[in-house]
């Protein structure tokens, strides 16, 4: 079963302001995007499990025109605050890379 890192063209994260991070998973072709979408694996519920936040606090969007999935979720620590280890939010996508997708 392939992992997100093996089938997505892009998997990245970044700050969406000081209190949220956004994660994008983008596919190179429509066929693979549709196969992944059909599995339902990439979801707010998955993000909630991976990032330990309630699913209700996650804004999850399937962006058909961009062949992408996008999740915006609250940061545990505000960007740049004491204890923040990723001030730009650029490493937050890492747990998603190892998710198996049954395509």
Per-range role (PLM):
Residues 1-103:
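Long, contiguous binding/interaction regions
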